[in-house]
């Protein structure tokens, strides 16, 4: 298995920033964001689209279903939430 390379800047690791679309917003101060990525198949060498669902902390409940948002990695807020909403790129 390959280990993920983490950049360390002055004693702290660089936090990831991802872009995805909101698929659920029924919880209080939480949303579910779907993030797409492309992965190359090891045998057939074809690029496939994979999606990941992430639970994100939304302090103001400002996002709606269908919005394109930017999220950032943060400390664990609950059992499943370790991402926070930075800004809304495109409103639906």
Curated annotation (Swiss-Prot):
- Cross-referenced NCBIfam families, in alphabetical order? PRK05610.1, uS17_bact
SUPFAM superfamilies tied to this protein: Nucleic acid-binding proteins
Q: Which GO terms describe its cellular component?
A: cytosolic small ribosomal subunit
One GO molecular-function entry: structural constituent of ribosome
Native organism is: Wigglesworthia glossinidia brevipalpis
Q: What does this protein do?
A: One of the primary rRNA binding proteins, it binds specifically to the 5'-end of 16S ribosomal RNA.
How this chain assembles, per its entry, is: Part of the 30S ribosomal subunit.
Leader sequence range is: none
For this entry, the protein name equals Small ribosomal subunit protein uS17
* Record-level GO BP terms: translation
Could you tell me which HAMAP family the record lists for this protein? Ribosomal_uS17_B
Record's keyword terms, sorted: Ribonucleoprotein, Ribosomal protein, RNA-binding, rRNA-binding
Q: List the disulfide bonds.
A: none
Q: Which family does it belong to?
A: Belongs to the universal ribosomal protein uS17 family.
Keyword RNA-binding applies = yes
């Amino acid at each position: 298995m390959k280990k993920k390379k983490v950049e360390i800047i002055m004693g702290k690791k660089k936090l990831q920033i991802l872009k995805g679309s909101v698929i659920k917003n029924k919880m209080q101060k939480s949303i579910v964001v779907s993030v797409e990525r492309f992965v190359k198949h090891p045998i057939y060498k074809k690029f496939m689209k994979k999606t990941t669902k992430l639970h994100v902390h939304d302090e103001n409940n400002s996002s709606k279903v269908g919005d394109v948002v930017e999220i950032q990695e943060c400390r664990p807020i609950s059992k499943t939430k370790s991402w926070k909403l930075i800004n809304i790129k495109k409103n639906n």
